[in-house]
Amino acid sequence: MNYVGIDHHRQYSHITWLDEKGEVVKSGRVANRRRELEGFLQGARDVRAVIEAGRSSYTMVDVLADLGIETTVAHPKEVKAIAKAKIKTDERDSYKLAHLLRTGYIPEVHKRSRENRSSQRVLRQRAFYVGKQTSVKNRLRALLAQQGEEIRSEVERVEDVFTDKGMKILKGLALPEREAKLVGALVRTYHHIQERIDETNALVKELYEKMPTARLIQTVPGFGIFLAVLVAVEIEDIGRF
């Protein structure tokens, strides 16, 4: 058995390859490309790899999977707690990972499937859009609150200016030219983001239709489609608990 520790960065990784006795077979920096990785591991048989969980570490996990290499995803903080080092270098970090894998001390985290990660990205993008839209709404409310008494009185005719009735009132406001441009820009931005939210809502609905677990969760009072899909995606496999 061969053990490969990967200290992963956005553009490159430092890889240390240990044999079953713990001797270093090879160590070096490799660009995060399949061809370079294949060249580095040429001749290796019965390989197990380990990489710390990170924002882009799954790109390496997928490449290794395509090469037929099973990869363990390690918990970064727990790795640090187990194997403290006074001097940190890429080489030492990759060796540390390979050594912990060989000795059976890797603190492992749940490794998500490609499909699950894609579903996560859908949900996170929707959350991103909703957050941006909330910022735009707050900015528009603040801008309207800074207008004269007559404008504020018109706006106060509705509880929510983001309803159809509220938007009609905004269009009819007798704002100074510069203020009207500011309000108009925010309204257009609000509608643009709403279109993006609607698009991602459709993707969430597709996920819901494909997920029996999400449909089951949605039967619980208080769970809508988005929350049901979110819980199902985060759990992924109930058997891991």
PLM feature segments, named:
Residues 124-216:
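Glycine-rich, often acidic, oxyanion-interacting loops/wings at catalytic, nucleic-acid
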Residues 32-48:
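Short, basic/hydrophobic alpha-helical segments
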Residues 2-18, 97:
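Gly/Thr-rich phosphate-binding beta-strand-loop-beta motif of the actin/hexokinase/Hsp70
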Residues 72-124, 158-166:
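Short alpha-helix plus adjacent loop in nuclease-associated cores
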Residues 229-239:
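Catalytic palm subdomain of template-directed nucleic-acid polymerases
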